[in-house]
Amino acid sequence: MLVLGSLQFVGFSPSSTPPKQRLAKIFSPTTTDDVLRCPVDGSALVSERTVVGSQVVRRLRTSAREYPVNEVYVDLLSTSGRTSPLTVDDLVGELRDAWESRTQTQMFRTPWLAFVYERGWRQQFRAAGFPGIDAEFAEVNEFFAPAAGGVVVDMSCGSGLMTRRLARSKAYGRLLAVDYSESMLAETRRRCEQEKTPTDALTLCRADVAQLPLADASIDAMHAGAALHSWPRLETGLAEIRRVLKPGGRFFATTFVQGAYGVRAPGMMTGGGGSFRFFDSTDELKQLMVDAGFDADGVDVRIEGRGCAIVKCVVPAEADISEVDAEAEAEVVAEARLL
């Protein structure tokens, strides 16, 4: 099962338990996800299955909201969990958001872009200095080594270029491929099936980086390839990434800086949604990370070629109690010697 990963449907097996009790156990909402959360209030999500005719309907729910699970992805946009009728104000707000993000977000929802992304679109990034997906994966794989066996997110996964390589590595206990675009998630699934990518640990999830449906300090590492420039609420998204990373967690991102294609591109107009955001310098990117909550000493930004920025962030690890006690004892001893 591609979409559900650890929430996979449990089949029937021989048992002495009466059929009705077995059905109640299988379809009762008793499985709580330890990573995914409601994007609105952060509450835990319970996996629920119901049988409608010959179909099994799956969803994730809280006490107040329900999020659908289709054959491709778990839909964890905040608007997907709405159970009350859509008001005029809700509609106006959603239309405003769609207009303000028409280039950065809405363009990537079109099926044609999902189709061409690995058929020429992504290849043009080489001209800007992007190393190429295999070289990028090699660096990501090395950087994520401390996250082996943990939970890794491929944010803005697109067509699954990095997702498939992370999945094939079998290095992680759980892999979440997250994107806002339904079309990109469908393309990720199609390519995973076509390439027979291992999907036991993989969950595809539709979500907004500015409202991540993830628990605090639940993620060991996160990748966002060629993505920062296309996030309409970049600062909020980066703060969300910092929120969900564990102590010692790692964030790896690639994006564009000015001059990537030999000319200066217009910066993103505030609230305009009319263009991508090409960053001015490594200093600007580093400051964005620091403002999001990353420690300055744990942020590294470098430029490859004419305009590919590679960002690496490491969250400080929690101090080991024994080390703290040893340091405190040493200070006491030193002070005693001065007396």
Predicted regions and their residues:
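A short SAM/SAH-binding and catalytic strip from SAM-dependent methyltransferases
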Residues: 221-233
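A short acidic, Gly/Pro-enriched loop at the edge of an enzyme's catalytic core
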Residues: 210-222
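A short glycine-rich, Lys/Arg-flanked "PGG" loop and its adjoining helix->strand segment in the class I
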Residues: 235-247
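N-terminal auxiliary segments of SAM/dcSAM-dependent transferases
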Residues: 23-107
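Short alpha-helix
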Residues: 277-293
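Class I SAM-dependent methyltransferase SAM/SAH-binding core
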Residues: 151-211
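Conserved class I S-adenosyl-L-methionine
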Residues: 71, 77-147, 161-165, 187, 250-279
